[in-house]
Amino acid sequence: MQANSRAYFLLIAFISFGLVGFALYLQFEKGYQPCPLCIMQRFAFIGIGLFSLLAVIAQNTRSLWQGLGMLSGVGGIAVAVYHVSLLLNPKASCGIDPLENWVNALPTAKVLPQVFYSDGLCTAPLPPVLGLSVPAWSLIWLFILTLTLAVGLIRREKNFR
């Protein structure tokens, strides 16, 4: 069980970081400029990945890290749902996103601007990836990863009862 749970969390971390890597590929190779909501979704994926790695390292507090990973996922899902809704109804956006100043003022945007600096519009029409928008894919993956963490936590709690 120990090796299985390590592999489980490592896989979640690998997928999470891989998706951030894919976002960077889209940014640097395909010219997709990240908007503030995109950056916030990156934070969610990074949170899921980091908390999953901590669950591998700190076995005694694994449920805590798993729960924080789920919380990161739920926050990311909320942002992705809002982002998809903006894409479906672009008139709901005023074109100027006040969130951009806040995201760009975060220390991460100063330290790693290539990854965390936002200079795109949330309603900018970008080419789809395999038929879906990037925020839609983000929503799907955030849901899958969060659900996977939740199911693992529920199964773990049942085993301790």
UniProtKB/Swiss-Prot annotation:
One of its GO terms (cellular component) is plasma membrane. Residues 1-8, 59-63, 156-161 are cytoplasmic. This is Disulfide bond formation protein B. The chain crosses the membrane at residues 9-25, 44-58, 64-81, 137-155. The keyword Cell inner membrane applies. One of its GO terms (biological process) is protein folding. It is found in: Cell inner membrane. Coiled coil: none annotated. Required for disulfide bond formation in some periplasmic proteins. Acts by oxidizing the DsbA protein. It is a multi-pass membrane protein. The keyword Ion transport does not apply. Disulfide bonds join C35-C38, C94-C122. The gene is dsbB. GO terms for molecular function: electron transfer activity; protein-disulfide reductase activity. InterPro entries: DiS_bond_form_DsbB/BdbC, Disulphide_bond_form_DsbB, DsbB, DsbB-like_sf. Residues 26-43, 82-136 are periplasmic. Belongs to the DsbB family. Keywords: Cell inner membrane, Cell membrane, Chaperone, Disulfide bond, Electron transport, Membrane, Oxidoreductase, Redox-active center, Transmembrane, Transmembrane helix, Transport. The lineage of its organism: Bacteria, Pseudomonadati, Pseudomonadota, Betaproteobacteria, Burkholderiales. HAMAP family: DsbB. It comes from Cupriavidus pinatubonensis (strain JMP 134 / LMG 1197).
